[in-house]
Amino acid sequence: MVTIIDKDINLEFSIGEHLHCMVAQIPNHLRKEGHSFVLVDPEEKWIQIRSILERVIEGEGYLQELHFLMLPEAALPFSRFNEMLEIIGQDFQPNTVTIFGIEPVRLQIYRDMLERFQEDNADAIEAVDGDIAGGNVQEMPVNWCCIAIKEATGKLRVFLEAKSHPFHAEELLYKYHDLYRGRHFYFFHSRPGCFNFIALICLDYLYRDLYSSNIKQIIDHANQLFFTTRQGLDAMFVIQCNPKPEHHSYRDVISGFYGEYLEDSPGVRETVTVFGNSSHEPAIEGVAPTFSYGHSSVITNRHHRIRKQTLKEF
């Protein structure tokens, strides 16, 4: 079962003012190597990502007050991970959250990264060590992401997560094998702005059973927060590299997330869910393109829709 880890962070978002989020849809070109997939064009990919970072740093227009930047799943070459963090830490404005997927690596490397950033990820190491101790899994591929938060003080905090629900034959990229299943994701409580959010790879919003769907755990955790503090989950950022449209049942269940079909869930009633996908040009060597990529979305509770009005002036 996935563990939700609460983390307090220092982000000075202005209370009552809207926040700016940039979803950077870029293509993923992947090829199979061993039991995993790697980027075909890591240098070209880095040039694309670097150009996005430079736009953010220049801060023209709305980008001068950018609060959240999202890049797709498996977007960043692992060889550029350090450089990515260096740019964010040195050149990004304070109060900025950057969420990006990283090229898959072996479990042992992922474990080493958790150790490297143990100040922010110490709570996640024990579960990974338990998996490693339980069998010969060090070579298992990990699809992972980073949530890099530059706090109001300028301090850079680095949080790492692995995809929590990659089952055999479930998804196009990983139909050949089982990936490592991530054991945690973070529930961020930003202060003093009182803004609560989650960031993860691919929301598992199919109710496989009561215990293994992360959507159920998110709802329960947010409800508990609401009942104890009267706060809820303000935003959920989901990075993807997924074909669209998805199965129609997904729409039914995401509606259930907002309490439209199921029991009332006040902890997520006001949640804004941002699905940041890759662009429409992804290519996977050996896989014929039969789906349409390039669709991101923002989902809110239906009660936020503006009602149709017939007035004299309109």
Regions found by a protein language model. Give the residues of each.
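N-terminal, active-site-proximal structural segment of metallo-dependent hydrolase catalytic domains
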Residues: 1-69, 73-78
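Active-site catalytic loop in hydrolytic enzyme cores
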Residues: 2-7, 114-230, 234
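A general structural motif
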Residues: 16-18, 63-66, 95, 194, ...
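Active-site-proximal beta-strand elements of phosphoester/diester hydrolases
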Residues: 18-40, 158-163, 195-206, 237-239
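Eukaryotic short linear interaction motifs
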Residues: 29-32, 78-79, 106-108, 168, ...
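Cys-nucleophile CN-hydrolase/nitrilase-fold catalytic domain and related Cys-dependent amidase chemistry
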Residues: 47-161, 242-244, 255-259, 263-267
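CN hydrolase (nitrilase-like) catalytic-core segments centered on the catalytic cysteine
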Residues: 89, 93-100, 205-314
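Active-site beta-loop-alpha junctions enriched in small/polar residues
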Residues: 103-107, 163-166, 202, 278-279
